[in-house]
């Protein structure tokens, strides 16, 4: 039988959210353990190591707001790549002295709550010690919103004899693509970065597209240490971090123009779009007119502007209509809008072909390649599946987590749809919290900013409960219903609600179609969390363990002693 380990709090995941929460609870005096599937910190930035992988959030917001970290760290680029993010997170682990609190190579497989002592028993597999069991009062899941890859059920997928893998399973040691025949299936955010990078070195690249990708210019720049040192010394960096975290809609340092679309002339509208386009990044979506979100006419105008600008860069007339059709095929922004550096130019290369899967769907995979309706067999040496993720809920429901009735989380949400309070807790799973998941700002926010907002709330809640002697915290079904109504109401106000995709889970066959992100923006989200805390956590049912006589005559004590120390897992 596996040995039992006891801690106050267990954090699952050593990415941005897990490391941040582990540090905060450690600093608060709790005995906290973080477990991570990978052999090092990084979260999704460990697994996503494909060529060109980098953030979509512009410097300085994609980092922790902790000034002690910012002081001694400088970035090399406006949009850092995965290697640099890995180094940054390792730096945070060292700076925060977290190594003794993290167990790597550990996969959590299941968890159940014990009503007798208000603790979770969590089971998993450790690479060195085999099966492990951990007991904790507080169970915190920081798994990332896009950490469960999705691969469509292609006919004959396993027949292909060469390397074939999902973009998030890119070999850590890399793979030599020089001169080889490569296929990329998909044109989402990961595919954009892969295609524009490998097209310069492969012998031949064939891209399989189902839906046009509304990729926008990144406007990448190098950053000098001198610029960053001055930015920090002036106080502007700290001000930017506070502003984006507490005042901006999605945690990005951009904001909409104050004027309405219909107040401007056509020339003024064009000038607003042009200015945003030149700045790049999120500006076309988040610094033009708010009506891009809630007015179909304005949204379609934004699409057409994007299409016209993108088509100027595509030489092949046929490819123009496939990659950037003038008429919107879905709401602009209704699917993720990744940032590119020379994505569209890649299709001007003689060694790059494009197959429109709407006109010529994939029929099957074969030993030597992929068979499509019109082209027949195309032979490849390597196939890359950039086919997306089961976002928001996939990682959570992959773990065998039982509620107080013994029902699995995946079954609860398949019956009722996703039910949460603030996108962080769900009823009948007491003392369990999750970050950057369903019904939170998640996909419409800057990850580190969202994680810190949520983490601050959970930390304060836990410390408040410890101070009051509360041992069981469970959100109410009434609070869940209100939050779900808020999620639905907000989503239905915007033109995105007409678009099928991972924002609603419709990229996964059989998954219930519903909005998986709360679209109210950071200021409103923070206000809701603050009101809950200041109101005494009325959205939660609070209970304490019964007191029993102390056999050593020290008065009344909890029925089960509070754990104050623990040995490392496997010790």
Swiss-Prot record:
Its EC number is 1.14.13.-. Signal peptide: none annotated. NADP(+) binds at residues 54-56, 187-193, 210-211. Pathway: Secondary metabolite biosynthesis. It catalyses: 9,10-dihydroxy-7-methoxy-3-(2-oxopropyl)-1H-benzo[g]isochromen-1-one + NADPH + O2 + H(+) = methyl 2-[(3S)-9,10-dihydroxy-7-methoxy-1-oxo-1H,3H,4H-naphtho[2,3-c]pyran-3-yl]acetate + NADP(+) + H2O; (3S)-9,10-dihydroxy-7-methoxy-3-(2-oxopropyl)-1H,3H,4H-naphtho[2,3-c]pyran-1-one + NADPH + O2 + H(+) = semiviriditoxin + NADP(+) + H2O. The record marks 336 as: Transition state stabilizer. Binds 1 FAD per subunit. FAD binds at residues 44-47, 56-57, 62. It is an enzyme of class 1 (oxidoreductase). One of its GO terms (molecular function) is NADP binding. It holds the Pfam family FMO-like. Its cofactor is FAD. It comes from the Eukaryota. InterPro entries: FAD-binding_Monooxygenases, FAD/NAD-bd_sf, Flavin_mOase-like. Disruption phenotype: Impairs the conversion of the ketone group into a methyl-ester group to yield semi-viriditoxin. One of its GO terms (biological process) is (M)-viriditoxin biosynthetic process. PANTHER family: L-ORNITHINE N(5)-MONOOXYGENASE-RELATED. FAD-binding monooxygenase; part of the gene cluster that mediates the biosynthesis of viriditoxin, one of the 'classical' secondary metabolites produced by fungi and that has antibacterial activity. The first step is performed by the polyketide synthase VdtA which condenses one acetyl-CoA and 6 malonyl-CoA units to form the heptaketide monomer backbone of viriditoxin. The product of VdtA is then O-methylated on C7 by the O-methyltransferase VdtC. The O-methyl group is important for the stereoselective coupling of the monomers at the final step of viriditoxin biosynthesis. Belongs to the FAD-binding monooxygenase family. This is FAD-binding monooxygenase VdtE. It comes from Byssochlamys spectabilis. The gene is VdtE.
